[in-house]
Structure formats: structure tokens, C-alpha cells
From Swiss-Prot:
Protein name: Chorismate synthase
Enzyme's top EC category: lyase
Summary of the function given for this chain in its UniProt record: This reaction introduces a second double bond into the aromatic ring system.
GO molecular function annotations of the record: chorismate synthase activity; FMN binding
Membership in a protein family: Belongs to the chorismate synthase family.
Biological processes annotated in GO: amino acid biosynthetic process; aromatic amino acid family biosynthetic process; chorismate biosynthetic process
Amino acid sequence: MRGRVLSFTLFGESHGKGVGVVITGIPPGIKVSHEELVKELERRKGIPGLSTARSEPDNPIILSGIFRGYTTGTPIAVLFENKDVDSSYYEDIKDKPRPGHADYPARIKYFGYNDYRGGGHFSGRLTVGIVTAGYFAKKILEKYGIRIRAYIKRIGRVEAKQLTLEEILSSENPFCPDEEAFEKMVEEIELARREGDSVGGIVEVVAVNVPPGLGGPYEEDIEADLASAFFRIPAVKGVEFGLGFKVAEKRGSEVNDPYVIRDGKVVTKTNNHGGVLGGITTGMPIIARIAFKPTPSIYLPQRTVDLREMKEVEIKLRGRFDPSIVPRALPVVEGVMAFVLADHLLFRRVWELKSS
């Protein structure tokens, strides 16, 4: 993902020797902690008992860019070794693209040379690198007092109630502040797992204390940058901000956010636009919702084709799959948002220097 100041590149494959990330643009002198990074990575493991049986330690091996606990300003390279890999099953289906996966288009794009085991480079395994990049971005945001919190808004047919910002930010539940809804969400995931199926959902993410003036029109649009970044997360199929698609059923008098003055600051009485107007932050909380499709790997029989025999066949997958990837996506969504906001903040500093 390439920003104006910051960028990161993911490398590796799900069943290769390892995966990782190279991050550029992080300023020197930022204090970081191996323990903090590991704690952030632990969140990616999801709800205990409801995630894949594949157990990777996710121990970050810092190759460069960190010295004596501080960023050096040079590229940060982080490696994660793959320790719990079983590729035997994938040899049986290498010519039979799995429905819902990138197997077929990847085979066409890379002329059949791609690593197909466990999804290869398209696997959710690589999101460990996104969370890592997000950790360093969050360290930048800390200096500005910006906080980001993602939670599960919906799993299948179960949706959390409308929550206040205070409820979202102060909740001790790492997955959803609505405890009653969360219990039903867990039941929904367990039901899908028992039936050999999977279930999708929605993650809502909020960023508070974001200063006004970040972004710009067209190419500098921060909303467009966020949406583009969210869509880079595996399994994302929809993104909306503020009221999102609900604005289509309302009138301008209902959607427009009136300006008021509170504690000497200009704010809006409502936040239907989700903190962005004209591609520029308003100073109000940025609110986005991201829709994730159900895990495409399921245990039920599915129709596909045998590309070698060129005939239609039925497959029944074996392996270790998540009944829902939504709980594991929370730190990934936060990481993506943090990276985009940090990039715009650093770019804004360049503007401020030029105008001073």
C-alpha cells in the first residue's frame, strides 16, 4: 500500500517459509515495544475456540529499522516464520479452483506459476503484516492523541445496537461493546461451524480526535484513500462512511450536519457524513463500516471445474478453516485506518512547513 509519505509491502505465502512486511516512511525516534507489537498481533487470533486450528506463534522477527527500542527512519522489515503448515491436501485440488477463492484468477494472472497452497499470497495469513504496519502507524497517531477502535457490528443476522462513542471507546469487550448481541453473534458463528458452513459480517471502526483539514479533493481525498485501503483487506466486499447507503433514502434537511460552537471549537451537531466532507476531515469522528464475506473455505460439497480435464466436478474441502473471519479482522481494519491517517498527518506537516 503506497501513500504520500508512508508505504508498506507484504511478502510471502501462506504455506511458504514465512510472511512479512517492509514499511517505509516511518520517522526516526519513535519509541516502540516488542511486547506491544505482540499484544496487537494476538488480537488477530480472534475468539478463542472459534478460529482456525492452525496455530502460528506470530513472533515478529525485526530485521531492520529498529535500534535500541526506537525507529531509525530506515525501512522497517519484519518477518514471521510459518511454523504450523500442512500442504498435503492442496496437491489433490491444485487443478480444481475453490469457489469464492482467488485460485482461478490467480492461476490465469501468473500463468500457473503461483503458489496455490492455502491461497498462497492471497491468504489472510498475510494480514499479520498489515497489523504490524498498523502498529507503527498507531505510534505516530498517539503523538496527536488520535484513537482508533474497531468492533463487530454484525455477524450474519445478528447486529449490535446503536452505540455511543463513549460505549465504543470504553468497552472492555475486545470484540463488541454490546454484550447481549455479542453472545448471539458467537452462537451464529458456532451454528455455521456445526453445519460445515461459514458466516460473514460487518466491522465498524471509529477514529476520534482527528484534526480537521486532512485530505483534499480528488487525488488527495482521504475518504477515497481509506476506502481503497479497506478494500485491500482480504474478503472485504463493501465499505461505507457515516450514514452510508442510508443517505439515498433521506432528504438533505435530514442528512446535512448543522455547525455549532462547543468549547470554543466549530463542530457539527450530528455526524451523518462520518467525519469527512469534500475528501477533507471535518474534525468530527471518522466512522466507517466494512463488510466481510463469509470464509470461502467451507466443508460442504461445492461445484467447480477440473482445469486439467476441462470438466465440471464436485469438491469437498478438507483442512483448517475459520467459520468467520470477522472477529480476526478487527486489528487489521484498525491498522489500515491508522496507516492512512498517519500518512495524511505526515503529509500535512509538509504543507504546514511550506506555508509557514
